[in-house]
């Protein structure tokens, strides 16, 4: 719905209050329906997830997701109006509250048998305290951004506008569900495709190594949060295609730097982030996992063409193709290769989606990306990373030396863009 909000916010003939009210009422209605149905069938859902004794956790999770959904439109308004301070404030305060509550419930409270401020630690809740902290974080975030609902009015709901929005957004929503399949279904295949104890071990290893890839994921999410409103606000500019190409260059460069920086220092980073020494066997698949995350980011940047041209069904088709690839590879190869199959499935899926989106977009909504330069940067990044990983894994001097050479190459090759940025500042 955020994407739809940004898209229709650029149409000058649509009243802002009408747009906000239509989008907000749609999300509020869907959120409450989701919450009610989830609560009514909570036990059935818990049984389906094979956690029949954790219904309370599921209920907290339902409330958390609903509240997060309610916060999307006011958060989108802040992003659209160029209010990064208020937006980041809501995220930072929420994150700090979450961190404090986790430390309070898990670290401090168990040390005080008589409780703190009348609150006593209940060992039966256990990990449930993390869910409670998440719920509080969601409530705080909504409370901070909620003032943006000032433009909301039931009377301003426009059914015809709602139909246009839904026609644009439903493929995006289904594509989002397919994307969730691409990112999470591999754990389920590991769970059901391997013997129970082996599955538990491999899921632990696979989940642990994904922590390293979150460095790329966090950057991608931060980039998208900032850049998506700009894509829509500038799509009528005569030089917008040139700008989109430059932004892709910047995105790829930043991701290449993150990728190489992680890879040449992977050994000591893994020692700090993987935790359990049993998970160290999974370090071998980290290059694949991170490269898949990088290609997913490029795909999401490429996807702007079908959003700007109102061809959102293309995103649905590409996501379904990706989901089919994910399901096939995991189903066919996990019994023999375990999490290696999942890692390759993710890489092949995101590579395929990236390539399909590029060629489809070139035919329908041409944006002249600097493909040759991007391929050179990606190839050098992969080559440097693999050389360091395979031959100099614990020789940080050589690995980081290669990293610095790559940075020097980038600085020289991008000197014109760097000079423009420096002159502006």
Please tell me what each predicted stretch does.
Residues 28, 32-36, 49-74, 131-132, ...:
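Alpha-helical transmembrane segments of multi-pass membrane proteins
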Residues 88-150, 321-325, 339-360, 400-404:
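Hydrophobic alpha-helical transmembrane segments
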Residues 55-56, 123-129, 164-168, 172, ...:
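Interfacial/gating helices of multi-pass transporter permease domains
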Residues 112-129, 142-183, 226, 230-242, ...:
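Interhelical loop/hinge segments that connect adjacent transmembrane helices in multipass membrane
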Residues 388-425:
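Membrane-proximal transmembrane or re-entrant/amphipathic helices at the cytosolic face
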Residues 1-43, 52, 56-59, 65, ...:
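Membrane-water interface segments that mark the loop-to-transmembrane alpha-helix transition
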Residues 7-11, 67-91, 149, 153, ...:
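Membrane-interface junctions at transmembrane-helix termini in multi-pass inner-membrane proteins
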Residues 9-24, 205-319:
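Specific pore-lining/lateral-gate transmembrane helices of multi-pass inner-membrane transport
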């Amino acid at each position: 719905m955020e994407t739809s909000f940004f898209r229709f916010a650029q149409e000058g003939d649509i009243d802002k209050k009408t747009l906000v009210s239509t989008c907000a009422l749609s999300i509020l209605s869907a959120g409450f329906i989701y919450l009610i149905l989830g609560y009514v069938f909570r036990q059935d859902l818990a049984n389906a997830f094979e956690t029949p004794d954790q219904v309370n956790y599921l209920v907290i999770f339902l409330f958390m997701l609903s509240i997060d959904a309610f916060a999307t439109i006011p958060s989108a308004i802040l992003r659209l109006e160029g209010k990064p301070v208020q937006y980041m404030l809501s995220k930072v305060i929420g994150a700090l509250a979450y961190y404090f509550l986790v430390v309070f419930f898990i670290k401090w409270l168990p040390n005080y048998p008589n409780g703190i401020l009348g609150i006593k630690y209940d060992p039966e809740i256990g990990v449930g305290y993390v869910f409670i902290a998440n719920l509080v974080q969601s409530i705080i975030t909504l409370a901070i951004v909620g003032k943006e609902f000032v433009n909301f009015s039931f009377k301003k709901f426009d059914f015809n506008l709602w139909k246009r929005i839904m026609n644009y957004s439903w493929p995006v929503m289904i594509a989002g569900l397919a994307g969730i399949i691409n990112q999470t279904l591999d754990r389920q295949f590991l769970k059901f495709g391997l013997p129970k104890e082996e599955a538990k071990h491999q899921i632990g290893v696979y989940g642990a190594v994904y922590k390293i890839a979150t460095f790329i994921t966090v950057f991608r999410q931060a980039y998208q949060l900032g850049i998506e409103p700009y894509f829509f606000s500038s799509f009528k500019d005569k030089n917008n295609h040139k700008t989109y190409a430059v932004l892709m260059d910047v995105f790829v460069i930043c991701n290449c730097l993150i990728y190489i920086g992680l890879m040449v220092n992977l050994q000591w980073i893994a020692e700090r982030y993987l935790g359990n020494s049993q998970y160290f066997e999974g370090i071998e698949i980290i290059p694949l996992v991170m490269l898949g995350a990088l290609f997913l980011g490029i795909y999401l940047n490429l996807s702007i063409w079908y959003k700007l041209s109102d061809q959102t069904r293309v995103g649905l088709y590409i996501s379904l193709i990706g989901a089919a690839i994910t399901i096939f590879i995991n189903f066919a190869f996990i019994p023999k290769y375990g999490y290696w199959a999942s890692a390759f499935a993710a890489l092949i899926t995101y590579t395929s989606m990236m390539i399909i989106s590029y060629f489809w977009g070139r035919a329908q909504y041409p944006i002249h990306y600097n493909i040759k330069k991007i391929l050179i940067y990606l190839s050098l990044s992969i080559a440097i990373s693999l050389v360091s990983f395979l031959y100099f894994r614990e020789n940080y001097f050589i690995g980081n030396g290669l990293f610095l050479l790559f940075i020097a190459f980038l600085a020289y090759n991008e000197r014109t863009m760097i000079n423009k940025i420096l002159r502006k500042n």
